[in-house]
């Protein structure tokens, strides 16, 4: 029988699909890795289970432990799902600028949510979590931005999936940077096997911290945290592309209407960057894998779908 023992065993093994109708001007092939096929509909499901499993194995979590994490949404949703399946209490801090759907999903999974000022960005959510952690020794903070289990799970799952599903023919990987775990873990594996492979990081033009600019507010939820995350190995990144807010929103809408892919704003940003790379003459005939981190349904209340609101 092929029966999962709990929902966490269904995380990973997400598919690749070729983009065909939004690729005007591209001379390279673009295939999208659809991370919304994970049970809680985002790439963060991978680290949600990985960080808690690592903590369990290290004896850092007990039955009365309270999982506490600052999140822009998707990691919190993943942790809330895993905590529900494992029986842990979950408390999350999140900037108030994150979508209404994110808040409702977190609470639907049974998590307790503490909102922090939007102007403070992820730094504010992190500071609040650190403050709370000092008040009760039962709190355990996975610390996604610096937890080695984050890139590790991408080494053993995401990277292997990309390599296997492209028969090792992947030439370029494009991924947005939130924690940096995805691009770091995948690059660590694929660059070792194929040194010619290139990795492109994507960040908001309105908060180009990785590019050496100043942090700023932006609507591309899930990337552009406003600081360089410790998990990110910048030596593995060959290029950083900044994407404008409207470009990200417009391409995310196009993915829904022209490819049938209902995805979030950061997926639009990653695809903008992938298209830019795919249009370069030197990349003719190459295979580009772009990571689409999450599902569009959790953005229905945001500017992404304002044009279809009643």
Swiss-Prot record:
Q: What is its EC number?
A: 2.5.1.47
Q: Which UniProt keywords apply?
A: Amino-acid biosynthesis, Cysteine biosynthesis, Pyridoxal phosphate, Transferase
Give yes or no: UniProt keyword Amino-acid biosynthesis.
Answer: yes
| One term of GO molecular function | pyridoxal phosphate binding
Q: Where is the signal peptide?
A: none
Family matches, as SUPFAM superfamilies: Tryptophan synthase beta subunit-like PLP-dependent enzymes
Q: How is its activity regulated?
A: Competitively inhibited by a four-residue peptide derived from the C-terminus of serine acetyltransferase (CysE). This suggests that CysK1 may associate with CysE in vivo to form a bi-enzyme complex, in which the OASS activity is down-regulated.
Record NCBIfam families: cysK, cysKM
Q: What is this protein called?
A: O-acetylserine sulfhydrylase
């Amino acid at each position: 029988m092929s029966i999962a023992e709990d929902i966490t065993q269904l995380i990973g093994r997400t598919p690749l699909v070729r983009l065909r109708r939004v690729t005007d001007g591209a001379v390279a092939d673009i295939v999208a890795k659809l991370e919304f096929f994970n049970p809680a509909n985002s790439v963060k499901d991978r680290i949600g289970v990985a960080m808690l499993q690592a903590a369990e194995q290290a004896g850092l979590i007990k039955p009365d432990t309270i999982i506490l994490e600052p999140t822009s949404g998707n990691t919190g949703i993943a942790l809330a799902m895993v905590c529900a399946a494992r029986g842990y209490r979950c408390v999350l801090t999140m900037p108030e600028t994150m979508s209404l759907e994110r808040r409702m999903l977190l609470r639907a999974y049974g998590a307790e949510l503490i909102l922090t000022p939007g102007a403070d960005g992820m730094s504010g959510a992190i500071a609040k979590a650190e403050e709370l952690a000092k008040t009760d020794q039962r709190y355990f903070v996975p610390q996604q931005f610096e937890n080695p289990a984050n890139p590790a799970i991408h080494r053993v799952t995401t990277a292997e999936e990309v390599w296997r599903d492209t028969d090792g023919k992947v030439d370029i990987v494009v991924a947005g940077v939130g924690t940096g775990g995805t691009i770091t873990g995948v690059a660590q594996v694929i660059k070792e096997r194929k040194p010619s492979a290139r990795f492109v990081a994507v960040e908001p033009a309105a908060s180009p911290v990785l590019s050496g600019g100043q942090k700023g507010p932006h609507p591309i939820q899930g990337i552009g945290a406003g600081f360089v995350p410790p998990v990110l190995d910048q030596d593995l990144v060959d290029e950083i592309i900044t994407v404008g807010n409207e470009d990200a929103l417009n391409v995310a809408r196009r993915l829904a209407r022209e490819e049938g892919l209902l995805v979030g704003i950061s997926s639009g940003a990653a695809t903008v960057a992938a298209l830019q790379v795919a249009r370069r003459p030197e990349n003719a005939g190459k295979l580009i894998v772009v990571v689409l981190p999450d599902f569009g349904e959790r953005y229905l209340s945001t500017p992404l779908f304002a044009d279809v609101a009643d």
